[in-house]
Amino acid sequence: MSNDGVNAGRRRFLVAATSVVGAAGAVGAAVPFVGSWFPSAKAKAAGAPVKVNVSKIEPGQQMVAEWRGQPVFIVRRTEEILGNLKKIEGQLSDPTSKNSVQPTYVDPQVRSIKPEILLLIGICTHLGCSPTFRPEVAPADLGKDWVGGYFCPCHGSHYDLAGRVYKSQPAPLNLPVPPHSYESDEIIVVGVDTEKA
């Protein structure tokens, strides 16, 4: 039996079939790859704005919410706390918040829209630890000049109750203020700018 002749029809069929299978494989591999470029539902939810009811926060107390996987400290400040903020400005590294991360619509001295409600991202600007809320005045471990604020237990940075860092601390900047807006007197939306709300 002689095999001299090439079956052109069979060759075309094999080339076409191989091309179709190869193209299907390439599309099958590309679909999950392209899909990985887009955020998952979980990632979208993590970056979504968060509504927080602040009506139950007692004066001088703090609550913690979560936004984008970060703690958000929310403090209801008293007149005494607000008065103490002015007394310690000379001890602060950036008292007018010129170098700080905060929306333009917050008052740079009290670092909030409404003086009595403070929102801060609760991550130290030094190495990312979470500062502890220390509202008491002149505790033994923080000294007689302490008027309340935040203490970072990792490396000892001190912040006042506006999130402003004291001079000569490891932390280089004030605690960040997240974008936020008021839906009502009791509901704050963290993650939505007042200017865009």
Please identify what each model-predicted range represents.
Residues 41, 54-61, 71, 96, ...:
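Solvent-exposed, flexible loop/coil residues
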Residues 61-108:
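Extracytoplasmic/periplasmic/luminal assembly and interaction segments
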Residues 2-21:
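N-terminal secretory signal peptides and thylakoid transit peptides that target proteins
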